[in-house]
Amino acid sequence: MFGMIKNSLLGGVENNEGKLVSKGEKDGVAFEEREYEGGKFISTEVSGKPFDEASKEGVLRLLKYVGGSNNKSAGMGMTSPVIINSYPSENDTLQPNVKVLLRIPSQYQADPPVPTDNTIQIEDRESVTLYSTQFGGYAKEADYVSHAAKLRSCLGPDISYHSDYYMCCGYDPPMKPYGRRNEVWFIKNN
């Protein structure tokens, strides 16, 4: 297992940066509108646990898959960001269920290995346009909730996006202590 996780964390990282559409800043908060192409993703759902615990569990499942826990025993390397679909509660926390997603590396998009863990699904996802804001550090639930509120305030009432969920994104392996990149994404309504 360590070998699988080591490969997924220390192998090459394929970054999915998206295409910048526009940038803005309001009240000291920078935000961007970006477009991301569709493709194949792996996903897993974890429920009944606090956000931080559920996120870690889901991420570990996906790391095992890209590290070789699949029908081809293929160590695929890592992609970023890790995306966590989160569902806000009325009390400024996140519900105890998450969906963790990771884009399958480009060389495996046409024929991805089948997961050996039946809690992992392969999904075809459509292209999306989204609004994002970035922050550093080791992100926890409170950080994502705070930055989601800031992004919501920046966008105001006239910009339309999905409000029933948002995406919490991390770009860095856990052993990177400085210069960490985290983002909150709101998916634009078409």
UniProtKB/Swiss-Prot annotation:
A Pfam family recorded for this sequence: SOUL
Protein name: Heme-binding protein 1
Annotated domain remarks: Forms a distorted beta-barrel structure, with two helices that are packed against the outer surface of the barrel. Porphyrins are expected to bind to a hydrophobic patch on the outer surface of the beta-barrel structure.
Annotated Gene3D superfamilies: Regulatory factor, effector binding domain (3.20.80.10)
Subunit structure comment from the entry: Monomer.
SUPFAM superfamilies: Probable bacterial effector-binding domain
GO terms assigned for molecular function: heme binding
Entry keyword set: Cytoplasm
Gene Ontology CC annotation, any one: cytoplasm
